[in-house]
Curated annotation (Swiss-Prot):
Annotated keywords: Disulfide bond, Olfaction, Secreted, Sensory transduction, Signal, Transport
UniProt cross-references to Pfam families, sorted A to Z: OBP47_like
Location of this chain's protein in the cell: Secreted
The species this protein was found in: Anopheles gambiae
Disulfide bonds: 64-85, 80-152, 130-162
Role noted for this protein: Present in the aqueous fluid surrounding olfactory sensory dendrites and are thought to aid in the capture and transport of hydrophobic odorants into and through this fluid.
UniProt key word Transport: yes
Gene Ontology terms for molecular function: odorant binding
Cleaved signal peptide residues: 1-28
Primary location: secreted
Coiled-coil ranges (or none): none
Protein's name according to its UniProt entry: General odorant-binding protein 66
Family under the similarity heading: Belongs to the PBP/GOBP family.
Length: 212
């Protein structure tokens, strides 16, 4: 099972929310009703909606995947641990497992392989939109998730997954593909990536689809 953090690098846009499936394990507040119906996915074209630049070095991604992918832990816990591993190897997490905002800002400027437009987009998504989401968490979703993930704190991984959704919503015109499917997903994500409650609704839909 690939992780959200790896999918950012491969631009597998329709699957960037998989790690956020974690929130459906918790009892959240009331979501936006629009988030209960998810657009369809064209598996042949799901990677072509947005050309996302490289966010993390391949050697870091590969090292963390190799370290955790073969473990017998549940897939979601492995996803959480792989993402946290990548962030730690890039020195983006403090000793208390919180994301280091100052280092994130420097990292984006120095390490993200993209245009200034992309760097501005990444900084806004991570620092202004997704980290505040984790800080607010009115339904205490994160604290409820911790018991399901061993010793892996979900907040850093969920921050990255949330940011990935924002990248696709706000993908620069030169890097985006216009198609009915891509436009529908961009509209959906623009409405449903703004609260943990909405993200919860998305993954309840995903789980219902898996059981059919």
């Amino acid at each position: 099972m690939a992780t959200t953090i790896a999918r950012i690098g491969s631009a597998n846009w329709a699957k960037v929310l998989v790690l956020l499936w974690l929130v459906q394990l918790a009892t959240a507040g009331e979501p936006n009703p629009a988030c209960k119906t998810m657009p369809t996915v064209d598996k042949d074209n799901e990677d072509k909606c947005c050309d996302v630049p490289e966010m993390f070095p391949n050697e870091t991604l590969n090292a963390c995947m190799e370290e955790y992918q073969k473990s017998s832990k549940p897939p979601l816990q492995k996803s959480c641990e792989i993402t946290t591993c990548v962030l730690k190897k890039q020195s983006l997490i403090k000793s208390d497992n919180t994301v280091d905002k100052d280092k994130i800002k420097s990292y984006i400027k120095e390490m993200v392989k993209g245009s200034d437009e992309w760097k501005t987009l990444v900084e806004k998504a991570v620092l202004e939109e997704c980290l505040p989401l984790m800080d607010k968490d009115p339904s205490n979703v994160l604290s409820k998730l911790k018991s399901s993930l061993g010793d892996c704190d979900p907040a850093p991984a969920l921050t990255i997954a949330c940011a990935a959704a924002k990248f696709y919503v706000n993908c620069p015109a030169k890097d985006r593909t216009k198609s009915p499917m891509c436009d529908e997903w961009r509209t959906f994500l623009s409405k449903c990536s703004n609260s943990l409650e909405d993200l919860n609704a998305i993954f309840m839909v995903l789980e219902n689809q898996k059981t059919r």
